[in-house]
């Protein structure tokens, strides 16, 4: 939840979830 993964998740899920990122406020964050 602290480090932006440089990915948006407005229309599609976070592809970066493979490395531990999750969607928050339309942006993918790690931790």
Swiss-Prot record:
It comes from the Eukaryota. There is a cross-link at residues 1-31 (Cyclopeptide (Gly-Asn)). Coiled coil: none annotated. One of its GO terms (biological process) is defense response. Disulfide bonds join 5-21, 9-23, 14-28. This is a cyclic peptide. InterPro entries: Cyclotide, Cyclotide_bracelet_CS, Cyclotide_sf. Pfam families: Cyclotide (PF03784). Keywords: Disulfide bond, Knottin, Plant defense. The presence of a 'disulfide through disulfide knot' structurally defines this protein as a knottin. Probably participates in a plant defense mechanism. Has cytotoxic activity, active against a human lymphoma cell line with an IC(50) of 0.96 uM. Belongs to the cyclotide family. Bracelet subfamily. This is Cyclotide vibi-G.
């Amino acid at each position: 939840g602290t480090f932006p993964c440089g990915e948006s998740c407005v229309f599609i899920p976070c592809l970066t979830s493979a490395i531990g990122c999750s969607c928050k406020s339309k942006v993918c964050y790690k931790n």
